[in-house]
């Protein structure tokens, strides 16, 4: 339910962009994101930091896109957010005792320390890769292709990365947790 709720603003953005253009799509994205955050707060009692970062970025860059009727600002949102996620993971990897991934999931899953470091580094590289691909597509291909990529390409890449992560984690789970 929670993951589905996170994709509703993106799907609405895609549909409104295709039907009415960037200004209406940006406004729709902002409103849908704010509603999504309110629902998450009411249903789960809190808004996670990642959701707060994404929501703030949507409101900021989406407002600029709506005001100037220009998609470029939302293109930069994706680049900035993925760069920020990658940087945060890298800083946690090398600057703190535990990588961020371990801090987030370590209570639910018991894994060797080096596995946590590999996962953290893997996701940092993934976000960096998403940032670079987004940067290329946003600058060298059409706006329509970028919207398609943002809606379906990044979603597909994220699902694949999540699946690979799950398979990787499974190999290192204690036998009792594998069942």
Curated annotation (Swiss-Prot):
Cysteines joined through disulfide linkages: none
Pfam families on file: IspA (PF04279)
Spans through the membrane: 11-31, 52-69, 71-91, 121-141, 149-169
Membrane topology: Multi-pass membrane protein
Keyword Nucleus: no
Keyword Membrane: yes
NCBIfam families documented for this protein: ispZ (TIGR00997), PRK00259.1-2 (NF001324)
Function: Plays a role in cell envelope biogenesis, maintenance of cell envelope integrity and membrane homeostasis.
UniProt similarity note: Belongs to the YciB family.
This protein's name: Inner membrane-spanning protein YciB
Gene behind this protein: yciB
């Amino acid at each position: 339910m929670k993951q589905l709720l996170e994709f509703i603003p993106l799907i609405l953005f895609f549909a409104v962009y295709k039907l009415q253009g960037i200004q209406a799509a940006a406004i729709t994205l902002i409103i849908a994101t704010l509603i999504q955050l309110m629902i998450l707060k009411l249903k789960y009692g809190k808004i996670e930091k990642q959701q707060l970062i994404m929501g703030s970025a949507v409101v900021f860059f989406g407002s600029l896109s709506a005001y100037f009727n220009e998609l470029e600002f939302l293109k930069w949102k994706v680049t900035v957010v993925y760069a920020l996620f990658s940087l945060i993971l890298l800083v946690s990897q090398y600057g703190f005792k535990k990588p961020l991934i371990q801090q987030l999931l370590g209570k639910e899953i018991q894994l060797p320390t080096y596995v946590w470091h590999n996962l953290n580094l893997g996701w940092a590289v993934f976000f960096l890769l998403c940032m670079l691909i987004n940067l290329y597509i946003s600058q060298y291909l059409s706006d329509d292709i970028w919207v398609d990529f943002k809606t379906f390409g990044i979603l597909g890449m994220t699902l694949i990365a999540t699946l690979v992560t799950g398979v990787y984690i499974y190999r290192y789970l204690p036998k009792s947790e594998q069942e």
